[in-house]
């Protein structure tokens, strides 16, 4: 695997999806996760509405349980009209891109519980369409 000498800022601002290149066995320091989160919450929000909270999970059993839940929910997601499987259905120009994206997303669904950290984003309030 090629290693790039990028700062967290550079990696977050120049790197596209990397699901298939994740090193699930490499430890990640809390400070790196925190820096990523600090950068992420700089995105603008309407009416200064930062209606979010985050839970960082590093406990191996809890990560495995979250990964299992994610994997079991995957087939239900795949059936939704706006899933990666259906969003561009019939668009021949998107066939290769969709195939790469679905393969990558399926890989993440199978391996999420192995990630050294899982960040769970929570929104304040209730979404009635859930």
PLM region descriptions:
Residues 42-45, 75:
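A generic secondary-structure boundary signal that marks alpha-helix termini
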Residues 46-48, 111:
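A short catalytic or substrate-binding loop motif that flags glycine-/basic-rich loops and adjacent residues
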Residues 56-130:
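Glycine/small-residue-rich phosphate/adenosyl-binding loop
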Residues 1-37, 42, 49-50, 58:
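Specificity-determining recognition surfaces
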């Amino acid at each position: 695997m090629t290693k790039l000498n990028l700062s967290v800022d550079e990696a977050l601002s120049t790197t596209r999806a990397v699901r298939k290149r994740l090193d699930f066995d490499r430890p990640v320091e809390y400070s790196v996760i925190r820096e990523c989160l600090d950068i992420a919450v700089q995105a603008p929000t309407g009416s200064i509405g930062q209606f979010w909270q985050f839970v960082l999970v590093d406990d191996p059993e809890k990560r495995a349980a979250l990964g299992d839940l994610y994997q079991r929910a995957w087939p239900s997601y795949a059936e939704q009209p706006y899933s990666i499987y259906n969003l561009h259905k019939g668009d021949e120009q998107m066939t290769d891109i969709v195939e790469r994206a679905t393969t990558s997303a399926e890989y993440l669904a199978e391996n999420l519980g192995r990630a050294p950290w899982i960040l769970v984003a929570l929104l304040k309030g209730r979404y009635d369409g859930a």
